[in-house]
Amino acid sequence: GRDSRKGWRTPFNAFASTHRADDYCEGNAWQYTWLAPHDVKGLEGLFGSRAKMIEKLDSLFTVSSVIEGGETSPDISGLIGQYAHGNEPSHHILYLYTMLGQPWKTADKVREVLTTLYHDRPDGLSGNEDVGQMSAWYVLSSLGIYEVEPAGGRYWFGSPLFDRAEVTVPGGVFTITAENNSAANKYIQRVWLNGQPYTKPWIGHVDVMKGGELRFEMGAEEKVWYCPDEPEAYADQRPAEEQRLFKSEAVEGEIARVCGLLTNERLRWMFANCFPNTLDTTVHYGEDEAGNPDTYVYTGDIPAMWLR
């Protein structure tokens, strides 16, 4: 790590901890590397690319769980690799995968923590309750949502543990249902909000407070079911024109027609540049107040392969 004079700590040991007497409070460099929930995009930039950030994030859960040092912090607990669920600085980390476009990894890790690091005995928490946060993580994550950055007003989706839950809110009741839910069917396949197909990997706090129904369809398939928030980041993954699997005038014409109707710039980009790799595909549309397509969601794989 770097010190206050912009120098580098030498020697540096990312596994080391000295309780309340080093650079990290109740943690080490492995845990605090990810503590930028307000600017995940900026953190991604520091890694150099999304792929490199994901690679490092993967390693967090597979490296040794040994905390090195003579007086290590007892708060570094509930370890999976160096992920420390027993202390709050780690609590947002599992949801970074969804923010980085790999929601199945969020689902895997959330289910693992829910089912192995909590139980109904006196020692049922893996760390200090700290004014209720350990329990709050369980409550929110078991509903299938978690507020990664509390000031941002977004609850990111994970993997709901319960088939149905009702939460009393100012606007009435907010109901969350999970169809086909099981230990094996832990991955989100499709989402509906108040009966309409929903294509975001998060829901706003304001929408939760209104009441209504958030419905998940669960399954065993690992998939990206939502539209990426930043489609331009994926543009360089498209194959060159001569490598595309097919080109149909009818398909091109239909895509051009729909793009002319879409008022949302991000969705227009997605529709123009992404196409599912299955013939058995349905596109569901939501409409704006004028009756024009404003949102859509594929029931096939998107964007499992770039065909256009």
Please provide the spans of the model-predicted regions:
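Short, low-complexity intrinsically disordered segments
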Residues: 6, 28, 200, 223, ...
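N-terminal functional modules and adjacent low-complexity/disordered segments of proteins
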Residues: 120, 140, 240-241, 266
